[in-house]
């Protein structure tokens, strides 16, 4: 959730603008503009849909629409402005063979992720298994922890610390783990247990699993995704 906020400085020079409705004088923080963005966005929510757990969060700073579809499917359409993350999966998460497919189209290769995303508690950890991403590679601003050969590809492992940032437990300081696929793809099968074990071997301790979803995340970009989680709920 809100993972991009830790890399705003690095991203701002890269982030493109694709606003459908420009803010007066380019100011995106005015009250009328903020209200307009919120009216055009799907409100944050969590719950169950067709047996799957879903999580949807947006900071309300961009027009973004999230829709749950049949089975394990969902879609997201977004435009420039803020941060969002959402998708379908399981509560609790854990070691699972996840098969997914779909489309992931950030406009102009903008800042966005297609990933397996989740949290653990005790310790509090936010983790990403990145399958595809736009122009920004989050590993560039995190500490390297080695590589993993898995799911027919190579993943680089990384770790960073988030200080006093939003989490599933409120504002906390916690670790953020990454596994970033070098051969980007929009479909495939991921055995999450392989990644959890690789992180543990690298000294990156996992906790008790909270939710885990096949997620789309975006920050100051535009695009669309249509994802189908094929692994049963």
From Swiss-Prot:
It is found in: Secreted. Gene3D superfamilies: 2.60.120.180. GO terms for biological process: xylan catabolic process. GO terms for molecular function: endo-1,4-beta-xylanase activity. Pathway: Glycan degradation; xylan degradation. Disruption phenotype: Retains 88 percent of the catalytic activity. Double xyl1/xyl2 deletion mutant retains 19 percent of the activity and exhibits a 50 percent reduction in accumulation of total mycelial mass. Induction: Expressed in presence of rice cell walls or on oat spelt xylan, but not when grown on sucrose. InterPro entries: ConA-like_dom_sf, GH11/12, GH11_AS_1, GH11_AS_2, GH11_dom, Glyco_hydro_11. It catalyses: Endohydrolysis of (1->4)-beta-D-xylosidic linkages in xylans. Glycans are attached at residue 27. GO terms for cellular component: extracellular region. Pfam families: Glyco_hydro_11 (PF00457). Endo-1,4-beta-xylanase involved in the hydrolysis of xylan, a major structural heterogeneous polysaccharide found in plant biomass representing the second most abundant polysaccharide in the biosphere, after cellulose. Accounts for approximately 70 percent of the endoxylanase activity in the culture filtrate. Belongs to the glycosyl hydrolase 11 (cellulase G) family. This is Endo-1,4-beta-xylanase 1. It comes from Pyricularia grisea. The gene is XYL1.
